[in-house]
Amino acid sequence: MKPNFSKGLLPAIVIEEGTKEVLMLAYMNEEAYEKTLKTKRTWFYSRSRRSLWNKGETSGNVQHVQSLYLDCDQDAIVVVVKQVGPACHTGEKTCFHYKII
C-alpha cells in the first residue's frame, strides 16, 4: 500500500514511539516520502520555501523513523519516531504545547 499523492502534499503527523505523544505536523510530497523511507530519517516539504527539508539537519534534533502508517484513504501519514532532542523549533518537546481547553 502506498500513499496517494495525486492531490499533492499529504499531512504527516509525527509521534514519539514510546509515549505516542504527538510531536509535530508537517507535509510530505512523494520525494520527501521516498527519502524518508530510504534514510529512515524524516524529510518534509516546506510549503513556504517550496523545498525539501530534513528534520534536525541544522539543529541536530533528528527523528529516527521506526514505522509509518497510512490512513484508510491513503492521504495522511503517521510517522512513528525516536526523537533526539526537542521536536519543536522553539525548543519545546512538542510543537503542540499550547493548551486551549
UniProtKB/Swiss-Prot annotation:
It holds the Pfam family PRA-CH. Its cofactor is Mg(2+); Zn(2+). Keywords: Amino-acid biosynthesis, Cytoplasm, Histidine biosynthesis, Hydrolase, Magnesium, Metal-binding, Zinc. It is found in: Cytoplasm. It comes from the Bacteria. Binds 1 Mg(2+) ion per subunit. One of its GO terms (cellular component) is cytoplasm. Signal peptide: none annotated. Pathway: Amino-acid biosynthesis; L-histidine biosynthesis; L-histidine from 5-phospho-alpha-D-ribose 1-diphosphate: step 3/9. Homodimer. Belongs to the PRA-CH family. HAMAP family: HisI. This is Phosphoribosyl-AMP cyclohydrolase. It comes from Bacillus cereus (strain AH187).
